[in-house]
Amino acid sequence: MARRTPSQLNMLLAVDKPVGCTSHDVVSQCRRALHERRVGHAGTLDPMASGVMVMGVGQATRLLGMLTLDTKSYVADISFGVETNTDDAEGEAVRTVAVASELRDPAYAREQLAAMLGPQMQVPPAFSAISVNGVRAYKSAREGNAVDLPPRPVEVYAADLIAVSGEGDTCVWTVAFSVSKGTYIRALARDLGRACDSAAHISALRRTASGVVSIGACHAVEELSPEFAAGFALDPIAALGATRVDLPGDLADDLLCGRRIPVERALASFDSSKAPFALVLDGGLKALARIEGGRFVMEHVFPQAIGGVR
């Protein structure tokens, strides 16, 4: 079988991950859809979760660790009455508590959610991808081993009640969260249940934003193709939180060779106090640089320009 010709695509994309597949599945699907082996992502989502996944394609995979995606937003369904070993609906019940009537009171729900705001130390779920002595925690947990993960600093910026639903033995709070990177919404649900003298787990989860990338910028994998993907590209400079600097085309060879370039070669004024600097030639991102001694010093050079610059 003949090999596919590489797509030559170099860009960031936002994909709306569906429920039921892993983050690696999404990477594999994008590789097939775009005919491009070099595809990666900027942060995982659990199989039961859906929503924003930021993908790097081609040269843009080098940007994934630099993106300013520190704030995450989610809409979560928190089901009371049962705590599971995974802190979500896919796990086994480890504790069951009768649903108290106060849990159905929106005022009580808002009071409890308000108490969750701010910086805190969070114990991650035992079923997580955190490595312990070189082994993923979820692998140890699946084998029946005790997993003792140390608490980590996280912050909850917002926890807004959308609705209280359910009747009989069920009670569900639908909550919009805004949290720091590394916060486990599953763990928030677990701790919320305990704070309410109850038990709780996540029954549905959707990531609605990752940094500056919102769900409205996302596309289904089925929409992707080499011919049309360029129209879906994210602005890499906005995603990096970088300062744009346009340079004349005659500096292409200097950039490619990593030579220092005088700041005065910039085609327009820019804020020299806000690094990093995204160097743009002919509408494409060619390098990231800092300034030393009145010259741009290259930190990352992209032989194939990264598209999507606006």
Task: Show the residue positions of the predicted features.
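Catalytic cores of RNA-modifying enzymes
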Residues: 1-180, 185, 190-217
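Accessory RNA 3′-end/elbow-binding domains used by RNA modification enzymes
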Residues: 1-18, 24-41, 45, 49, ...
